Amino acid sequence: MAVSSKSKTGRSPKPAKVQPSKKVESRKREHEEESSDSSESDNEKLVEELDDDFDEVAELLGDDIKDPEAKKDKKKEKKIQEEERTRELTKPTAESNHDDIVTDNFEEAGLSEPTLKAIKDMGFSKMTQVQAKTIPPLLAGRDVLGAAKTGSGKTLAFLIPAIEMLYSLRFKPRNGTGVVVVSPTRELALQIFGVARELMAHHSQTFGIVIGGANRRQEAEKLMKGVNLLIATPGRLLDHLQNTQGFVFKNVKALVIDEADRILEIGFEEEMKQIIKILPNEDRQSMLFSATQTTKVEDLARISLRPGPLYINVASESEASTVAGLEQGYVVCESDKRFLLLFSFLKRNVKKKIIVFLSSCNCVKYFGELLNYIDLPVLDLHGKQKQQKRTNTFFEFCNATQGILICTDVAARGLDIPAVDWIIQFDPPDDPRDYIHRVGRTARGTAGKGKSLMFLTPSELGFLRYLKAANVPLNEYEFPTNKIANVQSQLTKLIKGNYWLHQSAKDGYRSYLQAYASHHLKTVYQIDKLDLVKVAKSFGFDVPPKVNITIGASGKSIEKKHKKQKRA
């Protein structure tokens, strides 16, 4: 299924199209283009069951208990008791630690010959820590709630037991789907699909993928033929479960929820609840992996896992949150020098494989067009692109030995892109968790090495306190000013003289400010402290352009500051 495409470096980029929308809906559409109707929650079902129980008790005790207020209080009390009992039942009964590891050798794990042959073909012999702690209990049929660092080998940890189960049960296409893997993004789903294809090279079982943006009819045809191992994004999976005739899922024996916190973060909580209700739960093994254990993740674990799951956490609180082979640093840079420093860095590292993270789709679009226009070839990846474009870009960069990818956080979670040398956080991350996931695109695997560089303005240095609290070690890097290419005048002249680039720069500038104003860490990222003249220069403007920013009170402060700076 590998796809490739040539990088386009055309001289006349088209104007950017701005499609304003509400924040939550925008983030959700970035990962799925279809939506699904909401259905009643588990709580409503529970209330119905409690009603039945109450009526039975009322018949036994007489009319005195049938007072409406008494009935309401009784239902509320029983509902609370039931939820507490359910939480207690699904509370992990044990936590795996390093002593639980029996072997770190795949050949000693009791795997089938077809799986061992595939693992050998992939070049693996030893398990990572998360694999050694997860695979044996999953092979034994336990439910697992896992927390692991990015780049720890989690994908193999859940795919190997799933494939072994299909093999041992001798699944055939006519049996339909036996394992469902749910992933938050299309790119991550494609990556898991690629790993599954390698692992199942010597197995007879079938595998497939359903994701938003792909051809739904072709997906339905494959499902009707029988897909034993199915990788999916939430919205498209729910669509097929509800609407595809001939999709056999009554034999599902295992459910894997990968990056559960991210799935919930981008707005798929209701879809996941519906998926779990639709899939058969009798004797179903479940595996849930999440980088963070939020209340919503705990609720999802409660309804998806059987009582007493095994909790696996491969990192203690005292350990660094990022992998050992990663060299991390930051540079303090005024806003007007940010692009000049980035341009100089990329020019000096054209033989490296680099990922640059930006805060918005329009910023990625503008800087992609600009860099390609000035003959610094880059690929770009963001949520407003069509799925085929995103897929082509992803695989092209994966297969490249050198090159530059500029992207939004759509590429920050879970993606296993080989041999990335540098991670550049040109626009700062929202919080330490996002920082960790971004840098996790390099130094992957047991012996992986890589470097990361984060750009900070002087007013953003407070973010370092949060990283220190999260056990993230950083060093300050310094770049001599005489080593930075001073191309500001050429940049300004180019933006003035090219209508399409000017419009794209304006859209990028607007979306940068809006993204900045929406940061969660308001004490660090204070939009009132931004020097808009300097910010505008980084986009190629002499003076800040007039832009409409729909962020309420923050938008007003921007306009006032804009006018004040113009008078100065």
Swiss-Prot record:
The Q motif is unique to and characteristic of the DEAD box family of RNA helicases and controls ATP binding and hydrolysis. It comes from the Eukaryota. InterPro entries: DDX18/Has1_DEADc, DEAD/DEAH_box_helicase_dom, Helicase_ATP-bd, Helicase_C-like, P-loop_NTPase, RNA-helicase_DEAD-box_CS, RNA_helicase_DEAD_Q_motif, SPB4-like_CTE. Residues 30-91 form a coiled coil. It is found in: Nucleus, Nucleolus. GO terms for cellular component: nuclear envelope; nucleolus; preribosome, large subunit precursor; small-subunit processome. A motif (Q motif) lies at residues 104-132. The keyword rRNA processing applies. One of its GO terms (molecular function) is identical protein binding. This is ATP-dependent RNA helicase HAS1. A motif (Bipartite nuclear localization signal) lies at residues 337-353. Residues 49-62 have a biased composition (Acidic residues). Associates in the nucleolus with the 60S and pre-60S ribosomal subunits. GO terms for biological process: maturation of LSU-rRNA from tricistronic rRNA transcript (SSU-rRNA, 5.8S rRNA, LSU-rRNA); maturation of SSU-rRNA from tricistronic rRNA transcript (SSU-rRNA, 5.8S rRNA, LSU-rRNA); snoRNA release from pre-rRNA. Residues 325-495 form the Helicase C-terminal domain. A motif (DEAD box) lies at residues 258-261. Residues 1-100 are annotated as: Disordered. ATP binds at A148, K149, T150, G151, S152, G153, K154, T155. ATP-dependent RNA helicase involved in 40S ribosomal subunit biogenesis. Required for the processing and cleavage of 35S pre-rRNA at sites A0, A1, and A2, leading to mature 18S rRNA. The gene is HAS1. Its EC number is 3.6.4.13. It comes from Debaryomyces hansenii (strain ATCC 36239 / CBS 767 / BCRC 21394 / JCM 1990 / NBRC 0083 / IGC 2968). The keyword Heme does not apply.
